[in-house]
Amino acid sequence: MNMTQIAPRYLGLLLALPLAAGTVRIIQTNSAGDNVSIIDPVTNKVVGEIRGIEVNHGAAAAPDGSRYYVSNEGNSTLDIADVKTLKVTKSIPLTGHPNNIAISKDGRRVYVSIAVAPGAVDVIDTTSQERVKTIPVKGAVHNTYVTPDGKFVVSGSIASKTITVIDQKTEEPVWSLTMDLGIRPLAFAANPDGSTKWIFVQLSALNGFAVVDFATHMEIQRIKLPELPAGKAKFLVGGNESHGMAVTADGKTLVVNSRLNSSIYFYSIPDLKLMGGTEVGKSPDWVTLTPDGKTAYVACAASNFVSVVDIKSMKEVTRIPVGEVPKRNITAVLP
C-alpha cells in the first residue's frame, strides 16, 4: 500500500519519531496535486507528506535541516514547511507564477524562478522570511540553480532561450548566453579547484544536451541521446524531449533523462562518453541522486511513480508510488 493511503494517525506516529543525524530524504513534488512526498532512500518508501501546497513545483531544503521550501504555482507563493511536523508554517507572496527554486549554500537566500514575462528571479531572505529583491532577467524563468561552489545563481528561460548568470554576492547579472532553443534543466561540471567548468544544458526539441564553457560563455559541444531500438515506441512529449539532469558528487558521471525514450542515460565526465542507460517510467521529468552517488531517483510524470536506479549497474531496482504528475525532486540531508 502507498504511504499516502495510510490513515493520518499512523503518519503522525511516524513523524513524531526523531530523525537521526545525517538522515537523507528525497523530496518529491507532485504537480497535479496538493501533496509533496517524502521518501526514505534506505527503505524506498514514502514516509511522510507535506499537504496543502497547490500545484507544488520546485523544492529546496535548509542546510540546517529545519525547513523545506516549496514553490506554490496555484497561489504564486513560496511555502515553508517544518521538517519535523511537515506542516506549512508560512507562505511568502511572489511577484508572479513560480517554477523551480534554489537555495544558497549558507541557507540565507532562496532564489525563485518567476515563469512570467518579462522574467525575474525573486530573492527570499530566509531569516525574515520575506522577499527582499527581484532580479530582472531576459524572459520568463523556468529553472534557477546555485552553482556547486555557491558563487553564482544561474537561471534559464524557455521563451527567450537565454541563460543568465548572476553573482550570488551582489545578486546582479554578470553574463548571459542566448541559444537557438528554449532552455530547459541545467547541471554543472566543476574544475579541480571546485569552480564551475561547464554548464550542461537541456534544450527544447533536443533529445540530448549542450555543453557551455563557463569561462568563455560559449557552447562547445552538443550531444544527442541514443535512438530507441527498433520496435520501441517513442513517448510523445510535445517538443520537450529531454528534461532532468544530475551530476554525481564525485563529478565523474552525468545522469540524463530522456522523456522521448522513457529512459535515463549515463555519461562519463569529462570525456562525455555514453556508459549505458535503462528504461524507467513514462515521461521522466527530473532526477536527483543520493549523496554517495550510488542511486538515482527519477520522477516519472506520466506514471505517477519514482523510478529508483542503481547507478553502478545502470538498472532500475524498484518503483515508488507517489502523487499525481511527479516532477521536481531534490535530495535533502538533515544534520
What are these regions (language model features)?
Residues P18-P335:
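Predominantly soluble domains enriched in secretory-pathway, periplasmic, or organellar proteins
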